[in-house]
Amino acid sequence: MQISFEEEQQVFHLYNDKISYVIQVEKQRYLKHCYYGKRIKRWHSGIKDYYYDRGFCANPIAEDRTFSLDTQLREFPESGQGDFRSPAYELEDRNGDKNARFFYNGYRILSGKIAPDGLPHVYTDADTEAMTLEITLQDKVRNQRILLYYTIYEDAVVTRFAKWINDGTEPIEICRFLSMNMDLPTQEYDVLTLSGAHTEEKNVYRRPLCADSVTIESSRGTVSYTHLRAH
């Protein structure tokens, strides 16, 4: 397993013998999801989105009408910057401002696995069994940071979590904060859920993923026989 960073193309590549996960820093600000799947040797710099002026799409950079966050595959999307899909996080400061201004601000590549404080997580017996990429997003206006953690193992597994740090003096209300987000390229996907009842657990339900919202949850406070985690 290995984590590399290609400076010229601003591309992170997490990989082992089985899988690859590729992230690119776009416009020196935004994290774009490029690839997750079977192991590749290298992310080719020629594999890029075709940018053109799209109607009804907001442009965060006034000088470039071909670039819109609403059409990108995002790693950790925000609200209030022109991406009208579901955000990974939402906030409100004491002035009632809800616009997020977190931009890419560096990275670290670490040996081993970083454990999220107070949350369940997998473990390793030695630091040689995993590598972790830490990416920093910073809001310099409010003096806030979000740390994104990606850990790759010897097996075909990538685990993720996020951490919010308030470096400022003013309180911030966190209205929404997900552990991860994943945007996938347009294809025909199925949603697979496992539902059931007592002594009749894990009935498989499969349906096409359409242009809608699907929520799988349990109000029991734990995974139960009624609804198990989705795939």
What are these regions (language model features)?
Residues 11-13, 134-136, 163:
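Residue-level detector of beta-strand face positions
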Residues 34-60:
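Acidic, aromatic-enriched beta-alpha/helix-loop junctions
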Residues 80-157:
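Extended, loop-rich substrate-binding clefts of extracytoplasmic carbohydrate-active enzymes
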Residues 191-193, 203-221:
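Polar, glycine-rich mid-to-C-terminal structural blocks
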Residues 15, 28-29, 36-39, 52, ...:
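Acidic (Asp/Glu-rich), glycine- and aromatic
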Residues 1-9:
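Short, Gly/Pro- and small/polar-rich lid/capping loops
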Residues 226-231:
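Conserved small/polar residues in nucleotide/adenosyl-binding loops
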